[in-house]
Amino acid sequence: MATPALISETEAWKDLKAHLEGIKRTHLRELMGDTERCQSMMVEFDNIFLDYSRQQASPDTINKLYKLAEAAHLKQKIDRMYNGDHINSTENRSVLHVALRAPRNSAICSDGKNVVPDVWNVLDKIKDFSERVRNGSWVGATGKELKDVIAVGIGGSFLGPLFVHTALQTDPEASKNARGRELRFLANVDPIDAARNISGLNPETTLVVVVSKTFTTAETMLNARTLREWISSALGVAAVAKHMVAVSTNLPLVEKFGIDPNNAFAFWDWVGGRYSVCSAVGVLPLSLQYGFAVVEKFLQGAHNIDQHFSSAPFEKNIPVLLGLLSVWNVSFLGYPARAILPYSQALEKLAPHIQQVSMESNGKGVSIDGLPLPFESGEIDFGEPGTNGQHSFYQLIHQGRVIPCDFIGVVKSQQPVYLKGEVVNNHDELMSNFFAQPDALAYGKTPEELKKENVSEHLIPHKTFTGNRPCLSILLPTLDAYRIGQLLAIYEHRVAVQGFVWGINSFDQWGVELGKSLATQVRKQLHASRVKGEPVEEGFNFSTKTLLTRYLQATTDVPADPSTLLPNI
């Protein structure tokens, strides 16, 4: 019998569809009353505790999801990824971000070559360079130590490293290592972002890390040229080689730019941008800020989850369980979004990073073979740390649209605070909300309960909570570099599981190309209008032509061939 072309054509998918109606009729109040069920939906690995008992699912649902995973050949697809097969078929590439955090003595191959030695050559180079910068043996053009770093990149070259940086800022070991140092990220081509990044910094003490694999990324290279001008106008052109380094494989363009190619740190085609935080893209700026030893612990944490993901049975495999539950919520229950709600301010940049990892990976409308998908796939990811989110969008989550939620809690705060006379300490106050919110979503509050509380009749509809809103809880013991690495890898692999089950390519991103190509046409028109005074004519629809003309008419003061003007803030 031929293998179905789409996962939705399998008996396992059809079985889940038939099972769906019974689950829809069962409220979480009833499901949560079954202690045995709840116990079966709790998993622990390396002191990370996952409780998914508040999902709209029975043990039978979970077993059917395992059968769906089997029908999708999930285990074989995971193995193919780890074996270096070209699972990114549209670009004919391996997908080996797991190799970036593999121990030195590991063997992970791409096209028959063990790539781990290459990874460690770069890591050793980063360790040596970052230690020389940090101990003052590598100095700037005027002999001053380089205490400030601006990492220039966009997308995966920015969001992942920013997440890890923000998470480490208040970790005791990391913050001690970073004392007197500053790390900033320049991503947006908007000149305001450049202005904010250089504000308060001295070119003499600043090192710029330019992150672009090809050294041709339009936004990144314009920002890099802006910072090159900032440095050279203050210190002279020769200073660029002392104040700028690159994460790139295009050494001729790196050298042409003015950066010593010996100060270029490589990464490879088998590393996708959104999965590159464990490469030089993230490791270099983070090591400059926190020291290589701290970043190495982060890599070890990610590797720990890599091993768990590749070896644990599905019923104990945290990324697999999370991925299967997401498929259930999106493709069967019809919930298009997911809220990522970390009850730790240190994780404030987790949701924006996972937003990219998830939505760029799985925001696809066709299968890996190019067939249109007859079911919903991909999630709209967003989030905010608790308790801030409670005073922002939780209203909708409780009484508006149903949005499955990930609650992430940490047992021990990075920065505990105790105040004499308070009922609970600050972290306990935070965690009180972490434990309460999932129950509020699951159970809700009925009109009958409100009547017993003597709530006015006219307010009862407004104060009723339907409940039956799915969520899950992840409890981490601490939030140090190792645990941050684990959390990152859990979410990376969760996204892969979803894509493997849906049968899509989670590792390309053709959807970003069309807008970029259209921007090229606009850029040419802006140049022609500024330099030659040409009106906006052919090639644009009426709406775009109107907007462009309005923009140009309002900016006639912009010189056609300006002298250099840098931000002044």
UniProtKB/Swiss-Prot annotation:
PROSITE patterns documented for this protein: P_GLUCOSE_ISOMERASE_1, P_GLUCOSE_ISOMERASE_2, P_GLUCOSE_ISOMERASE_3
Pathway: Carbohydrate degradation; glycolysis; D-glyceraldehyde 3-phosphate and glycerone phosphate from D-glucose: step 2/4
Active site residues according to the UniProt entry: 360, 391, 516
Domain of life from the UniProt record: Eukaryota
Keyword match Isomerase: yes
One GO CC term on file: cytosol
Protein name, per record: Glucose-6-phosphate isomerase, cytosolic 2A
Organism: Clarkia lewisii
